[in-house]
């Protein structure tokens, strides 16, 4: 890892609660198959639970896992920005490249999402996209099927030094 870089990692599985989803549970991709704050199906559309969590259980998980994770992330972003004048959040996770339930075709290796350029400075978007596009043996796309999850959209505020 680069000197001065820090990490904030979720220590819970995304099936418990998905840290990349909005706390309200609203869909980032209305009209498309997706999973929620507490996923009820896997990426093949198959049920995850014998008995689905009710609203009270979902709220308990939100408070126990989602909220503390995002409080830690917000605090770290503020600390880094206060120290350096800028903070860059690189929100990354893995996913299968072929999931017919969620999308047609095969995903590129790198799926860079900046919510159509609203969550980071143009220079950061261009540099990241160029590096990924030029990585030997890998494919990349900018703002394709995944345009940036809730974390990217919520914290990406370039005018405030948060990218």
Regions found by a protein language model. Name each.
Residues 1-89, 94-162:
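N-terminal catalytic or cofactor-binding beta/alpha core of small enzyme domains
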